[in-house]
Amino acid sequence: MITLTAGISYVDLQFQGAHRVIATAVLQGPAGIALIDPGPASSLPVLRETLKRAGIGVADVTALLLTHIHLDHAGGCGVLLRENPKLKVFVHMKGAPHMINPEKLLASASRLYGDAMDRLWGDVLPVPEGALTILQGGERIEAGGRSLRVEYTPGHASHHVSYFCQDARIAFVGDTAGVKVVPEGAVWPPTPPPDIDLEAWSESLSRIEGFGAETIFLTHFGPVSPVGSHVSALRENLTNASRLAKESLARDGTDEEREAWFVDECRRALQHTMDENNARLYEAAGRFDLSWRGLARYWRKRAG
C-alpha cells in the first residue's frame, strides 16, 4: 500500500495487469477499516493480497464507501459482502437500487462492453438491502476512524458523491475530478453514457473546490494537488471534449464514423503531451469511444 498520511493509504489494483488505472483508498482507524471504491471483482485478488501484506483481512474491513456504482468502482462489493456479511456499504440513493438488483446495470454495461464483461469486471453480485447506508449529500459520516463530509457531485454520473476528510484535508472525488493516470500528464474527463450532465458537472467541480482540500484523490489515479489548477485544467478539457463531440455530430457519415473521428482527435490531443504507452492508460481508465457516446447522448437530448 502507498501511504498518503497517517491512517490513509491506497492500493493500486493493477487493473487488467496495468499500473495506475484504478486506486482504492484505505482508511484505517481503531474502530475499523473503510475502503473507498473497492473496484471490480476482477481486481479483488490484488486488493486482498495487498491488504494481507499490510496485515488486513477482508474480515477486518467494516465499510465500503462508493463514490458511484460504475463497475470499475463498485463491481466487487457483492463478492466482498459474501466474504464479510457485516460490511456496511455507503452509496447514493440513486445508485442503491442497482446495488440491490444489478440486473439493469449489467444489461447497460453489457451493451457497452459485450463479450469483455467477464474479463473486465468478474462476478457482479447483489448487495443485501440491509447492508446499505443510503446517502443524499450533506451528511457527515464516520468510517475508518475518520469523520467524512459527503457531498452530492453529479455530472459524470447521477449517483455520484464525494467524501471530504477535514482533518487530513483530502477529498475523495471518484470520477468527478477526471482521470489523471500519469503524474505529469493531462487531466481528462471520462464521459460514458447514460447520464452525462455538463451543467451539473460544473457545479460539482465548484462544490469540490469549496471543500478547501489540499489534495484530491482520484480513483483514476491517486492523489493530486494543487486542487485549483487541476480543476481548471479539467474544466478546459471537458469543454474541449464536449466541443469535439458536438462537432462530430455535425459531420456527414454514420455514428460509427463520427465516433472514430472523435476517438482519433482525443488520442491526438493526448499524444501531444505524452508517449503512446501512457496515452493508452487513459483509455484503460475511460475509453474514448464510450466518452463519445456519453457526450453525443447529452447533445442529442439537449437538441430535443
Regions found by a protein language model. Give the residues of each.
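C-terminal regulatory/interaction regions
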Residues: L244-G304
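Metallo-beta-lactamase
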Residues: I33, P40-S42, D60-D72, M99-Y152, S158-G228
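Metal-dependent catalytic neighborhoods of phosphoester/phosphodiester hydrolases
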Residues: G75-N84, P102
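Conserved beta-strand hairpin/beta-sheet module of binuclear metal-dependent hydrolase folds
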Residues: M1-A54, D60, Y163-V173
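Histidine/acidic-residue-rich catalytic or RNA/ligand-binding cores of hydrolases
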Residues: V227-E236
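Divalent metal-coordination and catalytic microenvironments
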Residues: G7, L27, D37, L47, ...
